């Protein structure tokens, strides 16, 4: 504390009298003045600086005149949508060439063995391997015009990207497969895309393909395994008329039969990405080089000023490469000459991978963020710890509201440093998408992690994203403005009174990132793309006053209750899962019933702490799930959250069933992209739903 003498004698003297003034001060006052001067100098030098917004954050999109209520990014110069960012990078092959050049043949793809450091391949090494592999594909009679589709059935690893780049180098098309689709769907994709060569990472996937084509007519001629296949496996392949060999053998064939690259054109096909959907067979979205380049370029356009990426950046690859979200992020990293480090293949070891890799770019999905959030608050298990965590968060949140995003505040050092260390301690850019995220979770983790943290929205049919939050806008509860590569309009959903004239309706997207259609499926293509080229997403949204978009629900999931009110179930579910004790919710209703009911899965990691805190009740997970008083308390908490979020009375559930097993891909209740399979959930819980309604009708 400064001395009273200092405050009494502190004045603003003329410069001519400064020496005389100082001589008249006591020694303690002079020391105090020196201390405060030093502190002031330090503060001026180190004070946090707000990121300058790249646009007026109160007007992030503009409406195009014409009466169709079409919105466009304010980052565009004129009406032309963004097709590419770099003139020398208009295809994914050119992305790779540019990355190799700007990195000066720097490290590119990295992997690690357990408890070891990452080992890196350079851009030149990857180029050589991809050209050898691509030459082998051509030697096997693949070409741009004949038998162009190459199946990739693997977890994320460097070889995945080498195969993909081999396809791009020789104008071939990659077709990702993933085991969570199930054998029936993989069978369907192989036939639909007429795949003759499939590259698998492990023997189990080779066996799965062999089972898929067993005792039937098929197109598969070659299976390439990333490891060395056993003699027994090779023999099984021969019985099915399939040549099975290792990736190294395939590369050796290409080296011995080298072909010069056959660069693609922007409008050439790059990927056939099969989307799982919640019903029916997978649909193969046809995506060109121009589609993917425009989407990557839009991301670069948004981040180039405040968070430019380059060869010094490192991306951790763990989200499935079979999905376009991860592919677009990797495309951005490649064209900037950055590094990509792959996780070990076990999500339980991800934190160890992050600690070793120390990434600067970290794409995530809401499910992981929810777990991080729950874990942090689960550790604040005393009133004092919770108060201090809330206090530190509010201080960081206040800085964020001014556009300040940093990791060196006193609150970072005291509270959030360990949180930041869990993701490697160097992350400066994060992006989440693929599913809705709670505004509370996003805001807290933005503050805790202290990096530029964006939220995007889109789907495979528009490559990956069509909106993204702007740098400097760290508010939550929306998915940002249209990307510079596409326009967005909302169209009427009259039965729910969502009208475009009111800034509400179904999201429609048009631009160079919108796909060509579904492989050999004109009927489904016509459902998705209208005559003017607008992609109808099936999502309902509304424009906010600042030109950002807020997603409300899925159009096809809307249903009507007996008294005529329309219900958007996902909107309600997204409210209820904010309850600390709730992990998953399935809201059900139909036109024969006047009320909603729900199946609720409680969070095994946090239920016990929640019941202790709110009910003074303890017990095992199964015991707590079976208690009537716990069920009543959970329902009460859900209804409370519903009221706070503005749900109408008919949107609140009247009864719940507590289920103790998580909905998952393995039990058939979630899609591979972790979306609820509503028809399957309805059938699976039919008897419990009927009992809930019977109980309501009795009371």
Predicted regions and their residues:
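Conserved C-terminal "lid"/linker of ANL adenylate-forming enzymes
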Residues: 559, 584-586, 635-699
